[in-house]
């Protein structure tokens, strides 16, 4: 699973809130490949933080101001040159980390955003709420692409990788 980067170069940041059901499995799947795994806990009411620590992650509390701020906490708390951001709900496959960091390693990008619209995601299977979320993400992607002349397909996806300097 691990790409050709040196140990300690990649930090995995997981934003979590009330994810006790799967956080341990996610961290266990990452631990053999990545040394620095930080869970930014959104003041969970369940055992998310304890289970994350038990699985080998370092846990820090977010400041309660939303996911963007939780990402900032994770960035401050990690040391890697490349930071991988994942949701704790199991919607992102750790086996895809080498693919998402490759453009950064090859100096082709400073930021890579995963896309649920490119295939391989089962997150869009579901009810009306899921459909509305997909429509909102699509609309926002169109607006951002028009404004910044980019070619993004899923700007709201939490599976990302970024160079620290970005």
Region locations from a protein language model:
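A short, conserved beta-strand element in the Rossmann-like catalytic core
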Residues: 43, 91, 117
């Amino acid at each position: 699973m691990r790409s050709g980067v040196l140990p300690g170069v990649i930090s995995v940041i997981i934003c979590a809130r009330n994810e006790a059901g799967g956080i341990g499995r996610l961290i266990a799947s990452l631990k053999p490949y990545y040394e620095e795994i930080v869970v930014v806990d959104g003041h969970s009411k369940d055992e998310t933080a304890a289970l994350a620590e038990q699985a080998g992650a370092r846990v820090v509390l977010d400041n309660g101001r939303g996911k963007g701020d939780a990402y900032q906490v994770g960035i401050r708390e990690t040391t890697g040159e490349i930071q991988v951001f994942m949701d704790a709900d199991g919607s992102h496959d750790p086996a895809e980390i080498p693919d998402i960091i490759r453009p950064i390693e090859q100096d082709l990008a400073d930021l890579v955003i995963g896309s649920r619209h490119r295939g391989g995601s089962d997150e869009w299977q579901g009810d009306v709420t899921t459909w509305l979320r997909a429509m909102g993400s699509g609309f926002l992607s169109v607006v951002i692409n028009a404004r910044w002349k980019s070619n993004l397909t899923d700007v709201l996806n939490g599976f990302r990788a970024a160079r620290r300097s970005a």
